[in-house]
Amino acid sequence: MRILITGFDPFGGERVNPALEAVKLLPDEIGAHKIDKLEIPTVFHKSKDVILSQMKRYEYDIVLAIGQAGGRYELTPERVGINVDDARIADNEGNQPIDEVIQVDGNAAYFSNLPVKRITEAIKAQGIPSRLSNTAGTFVCNHILYQLGYLQATAFPKIKFGFIHVPFVPEQVTDKPEKPSMSLETIRIGLYAALEAIVESGEDIKVALGETH
C-alpha cells in the first residue's frame, strides 16, 4: 500500500502551519506501507494541481490531506467536502472566491471514503482530543477535500481519500490567548494513530459520533 499525506504551507499571516510541520515529522513507512509527504500551497485550484501531479507519478491507495483549523482544540477528521468556495480571507496568491462552484460537473458534496469514525476513536485512544467534523469550512481545506472526492469519482476510482484538521500550536497563540493550541508532538502522535487505523482496516465502525447542531 502506498500513502500520500499532504500539508499546507502557512497562510493568513501565520509563520508556520502545524499541519505541514506535523506531516514532516511522520515516518516514511508504517508497517510495510510507504508514506510520501507533500507540501501543497494554500491556493485554490493550484493545491489540487500539485496533488494531481504527484498522483500521476505514483499509484496511491490512500491520499490524506492535513490542514490547520485555528480555534479548534481537537484533531478533527472531516466527513464531507462541499462544492463551494466562499473565502472569508484571500488565499496565498490573493484569490478570494465568493460563492463559486469548485467543479461545475461535480456532485454537491463528496464524502470521505476513509473510516472516519475509526480514525477519530483511534486518536482518542491515545489520550488526544478528537471529534468527527461535519464541516471543513469553505476555504482551501474544504476545497482540497472536495477536489480529492472529485478526482476519486472521475479519474482515480481505487483511491481512499480524506482530510484531518489540526489545531494551532502554542507558538501561534502567544498573541491569541483565547485560542486553544496543541503541541506539535501531540499532533504527530494523533496523525500516526490515524494512519494506523487506516491501514488496519478500511471498514468503519458503528459508533454514535454525530452532532445535534
Curated annotation (Swiss-Prot):
Catalytic activities: Release of an N-terminal pyroglutamyl group from a polypeptide, the second amino acid generally not being Pro
Compartments, as annotated in UniProt: Cytoplasm
CDD domains registered for this protein in UniProt: Peptidase_C15 (cd00501)
Major localization listed first in the record, in broad terms: cytoplasm
Gene Ontology molecular functions: pyroglutamyl-peptidase activity
EC number annotated for this UniProt entry: 3.4.19.3
GO BP term (any one): proteolysis
Gene3D superfamilies linked: Peptidase C15, pyroglutamyl peptidase I-like
Coiled-coil zones: none
InterPro entries reported for this sequence: Peptidase_C15, Peptidase_C15-like, Peptidase_C15-like_sf, PGP-I_bact-type, PGPEP1_Cys_AS, PGPEP1_Glu_AS
Sorted UniProt keywords: Cytoplasm, Hydrolase, Protease, Thiol protease
Record GO cellular component, one term: cytosol
Active site (record annotation): E78, C141, H165
Function: Removes 5-oxoproline from various penultimate amino acid residues except L-proline.
Subunit structure, as described in the record: Homotetramer.
Family stated for the protein in its record: Belongs to the peptidase C15 family.
Protein name per its UniProtKB record: Pyrrolidone-carboxylate peptidase
